[in-house]
A protein has these predicted regions:
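Periplasmic c-type cytochrome electron-transfer domains
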Residues: 5-472
Length: 472
C-alpha cells in the first residue's frame, strides 16, 4: 500500500462541500449545464457573459463573406466553434463505430526534440495538430451528405487527414472474480493530403475536457499548488507531483503551467482561449496571429482570410469576451452530498489515498478584476500537478517538461453530471473510460498502489467510493 494512505481518515465534513464552486455554485436542476453564469455573477456582467457565450457558440464561416464579424474559418480546422467540441460546456464525444470520423476530439502530433517556446517540435508538414476539416466546398458536401466517396477538387484546400478510431478490448478481473470490460483507442489516420508523416512522429489523441470552474482554477494561488508538489517524493507517500514549466505567450517568459491535459498552458485563460481559436478553429488572434497552415501547404496559405483592420480574425475585445465567459461559468452544486452512502464512499476515497492527487479543496486568491471569484472556498478535487500515470495511459509525447507518461490531475467536480450535460461518458485524456470505475482501473504509475487499494476493496465498498465520486 502507499505509505500512510490506507489509514488516512477523511477530514471532518464541511458544509461548504455542498457548494464546490463556493458562491459561484449553480443548481443542476431542472437541466444540467456546464455553461451557466456563476451564481454570484453581478447582474452588470450578465450581458457580457451572454455575448461571450454567443461568440463561443457561433459557427465561423469561410472568408470572404458579408458576415465579416465571424468569417475566417480555417482554412483547415477541427471545429467551427468553441462549443462544438465542448458540448454544453462538457466533454466531446468519441466515435463508437470504426466507420465514424473523429470530429471534436483531435490528434496532437510532434517529432522528438525540445522547443522552449512551443513545448514540442511540430511535425514539418502537418504542424502539431492534425486538422480534419477544411473550407473546401467538396469537403463540406462530404460532411453534410456523408458521401465518403466525394473527391476534393485539385484547387481546393484539403483537410490534412481523416481519422477513425479502432477500439481495442481487454478484460480486468478483480480478486473477487468480478470482471470489467476495458477498451482503449487506436487512431487510424487516412488520406494524408500533403505527404507522408515523419517516421518519428508521436501521436496523442485528445478528448476535449469540460470548461466549468476554470476561472476559479485560474485564481488558485501558485504557492498553494507548489506546496503540494513533491517531485522527489520526499515524504515517501509514493506520489511525486510536479509543476510543468511552460511559455507564457503574453509575458514572453517561462512560467508555471496550469491548464491543458499536460499542464502545458500558462495560468492565463486568455492564452488558453486564443490557442483554441488558432489551433482548433483556425482563427487568428492577437496572441496567435498565424494561420494554421505550414510552409508546405501553399494553397492553404493563399486562401482568403477574414482579417479585420487589426490584421486579426477575432479582435482583442471579442477574444476577451469569450475568455470572460469561460472564467465566469458556474460550478454545479452537489446533490446527496451528505447521504449515508456518499459519506461512506468519502471515507473510502481518503482511506484509499485518492486525495493524494485529487486534492479536495483550495481557497482562491484576491482579485480586483474578478471580486466575485475571490476568496472562494472551492472543492475541485485536483492538485493541478503532473503525475506519471504509467505506461497504459502514456501517449509517449512529451510537452515542455511533461513526459510522455505524465498527465495533469483533472478536476472531479461535476463528473457525475456528464451524462445529463451532453451524454458524453468519455473519461480520461483520450476518452477511453466509459465509467468512473473504468477510469480508476486505468490508473497506473504513481497511482498504481492507490488503484490496488481500490481493487482489493469488497464490491459493495467499491460501489460506495464510486458513488462518492459521482456525487462531486
Amino acid at each position: 500500500m502507499v505509505s500512510g494512505c490506507s489509514n488516512s481518515a477523511a477530514p471532518t465534513l464541511s458544509p461548504s462541500e455542498s457548494l464546490p464552486g463556493g458562491e459561484t455554485s449553480v443548481s443542476s436542476q431542472p437541466f444540467a449545464s456546464f455553461q451557466l453564469p456563476a451564481g454570484n455573477l453581478p447582474q452588470a456582467l450578465h450581458p457580457d457573459f451572454h455575448a461571450g457565450k454567443a461568440l463561443a457558440h457561433q459557427p465561423w464561416v469561410r472568408a470572404p463573406t458579408i458576415t465579416t464579424a465571424r468569417d475566417g474559418l480555417g482554412p483547415i480546422y477541427n471545429a467551427r466553434s468553441c462549443l462544438f467540441c465542448h458540448i454544453n460546456g462538457g466533454r466531446s464525444q468519441m466515435p463508437e463505430s470504426p466507420d465514424q470520423e473523429l470530429i471534436g476530439p483531435f490528434v496532437r502530433i510532434s517529432i522528438p526534440g525540445k522547443d522552449k517556446i512551443q513545448g514540442v517540435v511540430p511535425e514539418p508538414i502537418y504542424g502539431d495538430q492534425l486538422q480534419t476539416q477544411s473550407v473546401a466546398l467538396s469537403h463540406q458536401l462530404r460532411q453534410v451528405s456523408q458521401l465518403k466517396k466525394v473527391s476534393l477538387k485539385a484547387e481546393e484546400v484539403k483537410p490534412e487527414a481523416y481519422i477513425y478510431i479502432d477500439w481495442q478490448q481487454s478484460t480486468f478481473t478483480y480478486p473477487d472474480q468480478t470482471q470489467v470490460n476495458l477498451r482503449w483507442p487506436k487512431p487510424r489516420i487516412t488520406k494524408l493530403a500533403y505527404g507522408e508523416l515523419n517516421p518519428d512522429t508521436m501521436f496523442s489523441l485528445r478528448n476535449s475536457p469540460p470548461i466549468h470552474g476554470t476561472g476559479l482554477l485560474e485564481l488558485i494561488p501558485q504557492s498553494a499548488i507548489d506546496d503540494l508538489a513533491d517531485p522527489q517524493d520526499d515524504n515517501g507517500d509514493g506520489v511525486s507531483g510536479r509543476v510543468n514549466q511552460v511559455w507564457d505567450f503574453e509575458q514572453a517568459r517561462t512560467v508555471a503551467g496550469r491548464f491543458g491535459l499536460k499542464a502545458n498552458r500558462a495560468n492565463n485563460l486568455r492564452i488558453v482561449t486564443a490557442a483554441a481559436f488558432a489551433g482548433d478553429v483556425g482563427i487568428t488572434n492577437p496572441i496567435f496571429p498565424q494561420q494554421p497552415c505550414t510552409e508546405v501547404q501553399t494553397r492553404c496559405l493563399k486562401t482568403a482570410n477574414g482579417n479585420g483592420e487589426d490584421g486579426m480574425e477575432i479582435p482583442s475585445n471579442l477574444l476577451s469576451l469569450v475568455t470572460d465567459f469561460l472564467r465566469n461559468i458556474g460550478v454545479p452544486k452537489r446533490s446527496n452530498w451528505n447521504s449515508e452512502s456518499v459519506l461512506a464512499g468519502r471515507e473510502l476515497f481518503h482511506q484509499s489515498g485518492c486525495q493524494l492527487c485529487h486534492h479536495p479543496d483550495f481557497t482562491t486568491a484576491e482579485s480586483s478584476q474578478l471580486p466575485h471569484l475571490s476568496r472562494q472556498k472551492i472543492w475541485p478535487y485536483t492538485d493541478l500537478l503532473l503525475h506519471d500515470m504509467g505506461p497504459a495511459l502514456a501517449d509517449g509525447r512529451p510537452d515542455y517538461q511533461a513526459s510522455g507518461s505524465e498527465w495533469r490531475t483533472p478536476p472531479l467536480w461535476g463528473v457525475g453530471l456528464r451524462e445529463a450535460v451532453n451524454g458524453s461518458n468519455n473519461l480520461l485524456h483520450d476518452g477511453r473510460a466509459r465509467t468512473v470505475e473504468e477510469a480508476i482501473l486505468w490508473h497506473g504509475g504513481e497511482a498504481e498502489q492507490v488503484k490496488q487499494h481500490f481493487v482489493n476493496l469488497k464490491s459493495a465498498q467499491r460501489q460506495l467510493l464510486i458513488e462518492f465520486v459521482e456525487s462531486l
